């Protein structure tokens, strides 16, 4: 996995630089997501690995309809280097670069029960204040947390769950 990320990083940076230069960051984001999904489809992966398929045909297969010609050329370069297997990682890294550039943090909030809209708004407001940027939130429910919530922003995890508090209490009592 880490090798795939290492291989994908320069492609993601190049894609982001080209897309931003052309003012098409969102279009490339959508195109990369599409291409990564196609490349990870088992049937498409078999077709893409066929020895008679050249890099231009592979790029055409992976490109969404109406894709930017520079994007198609980008896919041709990846296909020519035999790196189509890292497209999923390229797409993920591209999204991180785009979020950083747009000053957006993606936060996953997992709670023991479904959060009420006002509770979610309070959490988002606190996160905006703490990180001084916009927050894109996804929510989830994990009943094993007993109560409270866990907020994961990728770089920072804030664990305010009852489960973790009980675990810490148990650890302090046994030591």
UniProtKB/Swiss-Prot annotation:
Domain of life: Bacteria
Keyword line: ATP synthesis, Cell inner membrane, Cell membrane, CF(1), Hydrogen ion transport, Ion transport, Membrane, Transport
Topological type in the membrane: Peripheral membrane protein
A GO term from the CC aspect: proton-transporting ATP synthase complex
Alphabetized GO MF terms: proton-transporting ATP synthase activity, rotational mechanism
Assembly mode: F-type ATPases have 2 components, F(1) - the catalytic core - and F(0) - the membrane proton channel. F(1) has five subunits: alpha(3), beta(3), gamma(1), delta(1), epsilon(1). F(0) has three main subunits: a(1), b(2) and c(10-14). The alpha and beta chains form an alternating ring which encloses part of the gamma chain. F(1) is attached to F(0) by a central stalk formed by the gamma and epsilon chains, while a peripheral stalk is formed by the delta and b chains.
Role, per record: F(1)F(0) ATP synthase produces ATP from ADP in the presence of a proton or sodium gradient. F-type ATPases consist of two structural domains, F(1) containing the extramembraneous catalytic core and F(0) containing the membrane proton channel, linked together by a central stalk and a peripheral stalk. During catalysis, ATP synthesis in the catalytic domain of F(1) is coupled via a rotary mechanism of the central stalk subunits to proton translocation. This protein is part of the stalk that links CF(0) to CF(1). It either transmits conformational changes from CF(0) to CF(1) or is implicated in proton conduction.
Protein name: ATP synthase subunit delta
């Amino acid at each position: 996995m880490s090798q795939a990320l290492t291989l994908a990083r320069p492609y993601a940076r190049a894609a982001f630089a080209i897309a931003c230069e052309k003012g098409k960051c969102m279009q490339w984001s959508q195109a990369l997501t599409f291409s990564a999904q196609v490349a990870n489809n088992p049937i498409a992966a078999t077709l893409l690995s066929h020895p008679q398929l050249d890099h231009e045909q592979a790029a055409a297969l992976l490109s969404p309809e109406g894709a930017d010609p520079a994007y198609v050329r980008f896919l041709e370069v990846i296909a020519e280097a035999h790196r189509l297997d890292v497209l999923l990682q390229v797409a993920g890294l591209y999204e991180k670069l785009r979020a950083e550039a747009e000053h957006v943090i993606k936060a996953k909030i997992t709670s023991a029960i479904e959060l009420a809209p006002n509770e979610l708004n309070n959490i988002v407001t606190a996160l905006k204040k703490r990180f001084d940027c916009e927050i894109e939130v996804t929510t989830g429910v994990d009943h094993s947390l007993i109560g409270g919530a866990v907020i994961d922003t990728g770089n920072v995890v804030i664990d305010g769950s009852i489960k973790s508090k009980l675990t810490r209490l148990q650890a302090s009592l046994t030591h």
